[in-house]
């Protein structure tokens, strides 16, 4: 039976002290990290953010606390989320894989996809990553956990893939790893130094 991302799900994993993981202070630090990375590589203040698989949009408030004028747009596959928060938090209905064909009238300085990819099937991941690479102006924050990580929280439907699987998928999409779950848009590739990338350059002797 498919998982249902309804109010009961979000109440359990985000508000119930017996199950919720991640403190508000930790989220604020994560948001600050992603904003700083994007602004560093863009060389200017953050203008807009696309939050994919945003749930109830927990990133929105800390983003706006840091950058009050930022244009925030969320996407989620939950009917509950869009019905309840779609208008007030600017959340549209979309699955991750639909990013392959979904486009907006702008590219995004920061694209966020936090705690989503490890619940998806390979074909949907690859399709969505192609869309992220096409829409990213600056940095994509792709927080994903692997078979080498100790994972807390919702394990239903969790795919414990090797880190190398994701690195290949990100590389195939043209995304460049710069550390701490951050990946540079392909168009930034010529503007960065070799050691800013969190990988060995191709052909490097070991």
For the regions a protein language model found, what residue spans apply to each?
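Class I (Rossmann-like) S-adenosyl-L-methionine-dependent methyltransferase catalytic domain
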Residues: 1-104, 120-206
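A conserved beta-strand element that flanks and buttresses the S-adenosyl-L-methionine
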Residues: 112
């Amino acid at each position: 039976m498919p998982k249902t991302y309804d109010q009961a799900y979000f109440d359990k994993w985000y508000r119930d002290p017996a199950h919720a993981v991640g403190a508000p202070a930790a989220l604020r630090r994560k948001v600050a990290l992603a904003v700083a990375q994007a602004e560093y590589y863009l060389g200017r203040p953050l203008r807009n953010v696309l939050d994919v698989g945003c749930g109830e949009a927990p990133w929105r408030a800390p983003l706006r606390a840091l950058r009050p004028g930022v244009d925030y747009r969320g996407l989620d596959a939950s009917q509950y989320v869009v019905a309840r928060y779609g208008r007030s938090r600017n959340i549209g209905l979309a699955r991750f894989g639909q990013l392959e064909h979904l486009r907006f009238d702008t590219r995004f300085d920061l694209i966020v996809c936090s705690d989503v990819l490890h619940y998806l099937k390979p074909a949907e991941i690859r399709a969505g990553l192609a869309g992220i690479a096409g829409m990213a102006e600056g940095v994509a924050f792709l927080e994903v956990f692997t078979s080498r990580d100790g994972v807390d929280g919702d394990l239903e439907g969790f795919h414990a893939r090797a880190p190398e699987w994701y690195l290949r998928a990100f590389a195939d999409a043209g995304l460049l790893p710069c550390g701490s779950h951050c990946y540079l848009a392909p168009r930034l590739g010529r503007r960065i130094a070799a050691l800013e990338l969190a990988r060995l350059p191709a052909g490097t002797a070991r």
